[in-house]
């Protein structure tokens, strides 16, 4: 198992930790922005399937007419 040769300085540790946290912060901001644009309908990168006409999704619901008793 590999072991670091020297102890990492606290400033370098803090810098790396802040970089790691910053990446998560930007990812969260992008996700919130995308969710906001999807909810308002301003998204240009996703299709909104629920705004399509209903004739594409209509399915026969009355099975009594098709069944023979």
From Swiss-Prot:
- Where does the record say this protein resides? Plastid, Chloroplast
Q: Which domain of life is it from?
A: Eukaryota
Report which residue ranges the record marks as coiled coil: none
Record bears the keyword Metal-binding: no
- Single annotated GO MF: structural constituent of ribosome
Q: What GO biological process terms are annotated to this protein in UniProt? A: translation
The record's listing under InterPro entries reads: Ribosomal_bL32, Ribosomal_bL32_plant/cyanobact
Q: Does the keyword Nucleotide-binding apply?
A: no
Give the primary localization class: plastid
Q: Which GO terms describe its cellular component?
A: chloroplast; large ribosomal subunit
Q: Which UniProt keywords apply?
A: Chloroplast, Plastid, Ribonucleoprotein, Ribosomal protein
The UniProt entry, under HAMAP family, shows: Ribosomal_bL32
- UniProt record similarity statement: Belongs to the bacterial ribosomal protein bL32 family.
Matching PANTHER family? 50S RIBOSOMAL PROTEIN L32, CHLOROPLASTIC, LARGE RIBOSOMAL SUBUNIT PROTEIN BL32C
Put simply, this protein is called Large ribosomal subunit protein bL32c
Primary gene name: rpl32-A
């Amino acid at each position: 198992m590999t072991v670091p040769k020297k102890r990492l300085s606290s400033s370098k540790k803090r810098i790396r930790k802040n970089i790691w946290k910053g990446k998560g912060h930007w990812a969260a901001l992008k996700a919130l922005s995308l969710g906001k644009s999807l909810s308002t309908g301003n998204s240009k990168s996703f299709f909104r399937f629920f705004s399509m006409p209903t004739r594409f999704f209509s399915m026969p619901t009355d099975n009594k007419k098709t069944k023979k008793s």
